[in-house]
């Protein structure tokens, strides 16, 4: 059972977050348990996590703010193990370094900053930049399969749906291009083939004409000359 001081503190922090949201961070308490908070970290531009949306949970002890919370991440990210507590100076891994003045926003800001780092810690993993980028690209789709995420962060679900519609529209616009290109190629081939056929046909026609007899006027001339030659002896008589 959470202490009254803990409940009042968390309610106050939630109101502060709603009034002054933290850049790249969204956090909300569970409707049924104010000790369990759900968060989304947005990957910073210029990092392998750019475009990623990383969902996780913060579990506060009833003694908060005098004791630190436990922090886990649900979304595969390439930096931290999923469903495993992350070792931070602001988490229950290090109660000796905890400061009661720290808040939910400062915890998540610190987590986001540490996520961009490469320092190893308990609960961290070592992956390539390409792997982190791949996970960032698929993060929103992964999150939208989680019922708690869909319930607590409807704006991100809407964002995912809009992305899907945009991708479908792009696919529909680009798909007809391939048949058109094929048709153009076929038409081009058709244009070339008749020309080739005409060329071959013309060559055959010329050969055929060459094989035909002499023109008619030449034949008539030859017949006339032949007739005159044959008539010469008769004229001498």
Swiss-Prot record:
GO cellular component: membrane
Disulfide bonds: none
Function: Accepts the ubiquitin from the E1 complex and catalyzes its covalent attachment to other proteins.
Protein family (similarity comment): Belongs to the ubiquitin-conjugating enzyme family.
Catalyzed chemical reaction(s): S-ubiquitinyl-[E1 ubiquitin-activating enzyme]-L-cysteine + [E2 ubiquitin-conjugating enzyme]-L-cysteine = [E1 ubiquitin-activating enzyme]-L-cysteine + S-ubiquitinyl-[E2 ubiquitin-conjugating enzyme]-L-cysteine
Any Pfam family matching the protein: UQ_con
Annotated GO MF terms: ATP binding; ubiquitin conjugating enzyme activity; ubiquitin-protein transferase activity
Main localization, broad class: membrane
Sequence segments annotated as region (Disordered): 168-207
SUPFAM superfamilies the record matches: UBC-like
Domain of life: Eukaryota
Pathway membership, UniProt: Protein modification; protein ubiquitination
The enzyme's E.C. designation: 2.3.2.23
Native source species: Arabidopsis thaliana
Designated name of the protein: Ubiquitin-conjugating enzyme E2 34
Start and end residues of each UBC core domain: 5-162
Transmembrane segment boundaries: 214-234
Active site positions, chain numbering: 87 (glycyl thioester intermediate)
Keyword Cell division on entry: no
UniProt-annotated location(s): Membrane
Biased composition (Basic and acidic residues): 180-204
One GO BP: negative regulation of stomatal opening
InterPro entries: Ub_conjugating_enzyme, UBQ-conjugat_E2_core, UBQ-conjugating_enzyme/RWD
Topology term for the membrane: Single-pass membrane protein
């Amino acid at each position: 059972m959470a202490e009254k001081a803990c409940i009042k503190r968390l309610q106050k922090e939630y109101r502060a977050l709603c009034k002054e949201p933290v850049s790249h961070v969204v956090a909300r308490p569970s409707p049924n348990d104010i000790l369990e908070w759900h968060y989304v970290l947005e990957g910073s531009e210029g990092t392998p996590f750019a475009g990623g949306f990383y969902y996780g949970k913060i579990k506060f002890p009833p003694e908060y703010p005098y004791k630190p919370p436990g922090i886990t991440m649900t979304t595969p990210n390439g930096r931290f193990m999923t469903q495993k507590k992350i070792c931070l100076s602001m988490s229950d891994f290090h109660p000796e370094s905890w400061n009661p003045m720290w808040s939910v926003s400062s915890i998540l800001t610190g987590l986001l900053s540490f996520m961009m780092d490469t320092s190893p810690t308990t609960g961290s993993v070592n992956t390539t930049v390409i792997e982190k980028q791949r996970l960032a690209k698929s993060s929103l789709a992964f999150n939208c399969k989680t019922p708690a995420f869909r319930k607590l962060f409807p704006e991100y679900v809407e964002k995912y749906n809009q992305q899907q519609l945009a991708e479908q529209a792009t696919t529909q616009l680009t798909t007809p291009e391939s048949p058109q290109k094929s048709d153009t190629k076929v038409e081009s081939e058709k244009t070339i083939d008749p020309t080739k056929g005409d060329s071959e046909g013309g060559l055959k026609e010329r050969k055929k004409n060459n094989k035909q007899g002499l023109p008619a006027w030449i034949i008539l001339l030859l017949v006339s000359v032949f007739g005159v030659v044959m008539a010469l002896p008769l004229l001498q008589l």
